[in-house]
Amino acid sequence: MAINLYKTSTPSTRNGTVDSQVKSNPRNNLIYGQHHCGKGRNARGIITAGHRGGGHKRLYRKIDFRRNEKDIYGRIVTIEYDPNRNAYICLIHYRDGEKRYILHPRGAIIGDTIVSGTEVPIKMGNALPLTDMPLGTAIHNIEITLGKGGQLARAAGAVAKLIAKEGKSATLKLPSGEVRLISKNCSATVGQVGNVGVNQKNLGRAGSKRWLGKRPVVRGVVMNPVDHPHGGGEGRAPIGRKKPTTPWGYPALGKRSRKRNKYSDNLILRRRSK
């Protein structure tokens, strides 16, 4: 990630970092507008996810998570910024004239060739079924349901590892630390998702955060009792409860929120680490 350094004339330029290597110039046939609904509200207009709202208008880029251009080689033409995710995307020109966006694999550069299918080379950016991959392969964009497209390990810097194959299932270690079973016929992309250092990027000022649609985070202990169970009291008061809670009174900070008796419980060999 190439970082621009500016003359430190203001606090925002002194502390902020800007990636100068990747630009955004999407193709018209691979984008479409979308109704802005990322305000953290449900259908009744009630806040269900805090600290969201505002932000710049976005055009959605159609990403090829299925990689169903089988046995047709494609060339990386551009590496672009995508406002809808923290990973970069790259435009692929296939030999049959098809043009698609895929997630940018770490280390891939303009001019590299990729291909998807069975028995293709184990090369960064290639997509193939898990049954054709050797053990220890680093992968991303992993399918859970055959033919549905990649759903796991799609964020910037995400990488999973193929650690075992037995019967009809393959055992994967996911970025969260979870170890689970997936059908060997499901496909995945070789390599790690690019833009690894995104979590080390310093936005420099509050306005840059608001451009991304993220609002300020306020602690419940400094609110009034009407706004949060932790609020109220004289001066710096404790929360007044045995355990911390959410604004709606449910247990927070450690309470397991996963649905009980979920169908995939039998597929998870080791629960994800906190």
UniProtKB/Swiss-Prot annotation:
Disulfide bonds: none annotated. Residues 1-22, 224-274 are annotated as: Disordered. The lineage of its organism: Eukaryota, Viridiplantae, Streptophyta, Embryophyta, Tracheophyta. InterPro entries: NA-bd_OB-fold (IPR012340), Rib_uL2_dom2 (IPR014722), Ribosomal_uL2 (IPR002171), Ribosomal_uL2_bac/org-type (IPR005880), Ribosomal_uL2_C (IPR022669), Ribosomal_uL2_CS (IPR022671), Ribosomal_uL2_dom3 (IPR014726), Ribosomal_uL2_RNA-bd_dom (IPR022666). It comes from the Eukaryota. The gene is rpl2-A. GO terms for biological process: translation. The keyword Ribosomal protein applies. Keywords: Chloroplast, Plastid, Ribonucleoprotein, Ribosomal protein. Part of the 50S ribosomal subunit. SUPFAM superfamilies: Nucleic acid-binding proteins, Translation proteins SH3-like domain. GO terms for cellular component: chloroplast; large ribosomal subunit. SMART domains: Ribosomal_L2, Ribosomal_L2_C. This is Large ribosomal subunit protein uL2cz/uL2cy. Belongs to the universal ribosomal protein uL2 family. GO terms for molecular function: rRNA binding; structural constituent of ribosome; transferase activity. It is found in: Plastid, Chloroplast.
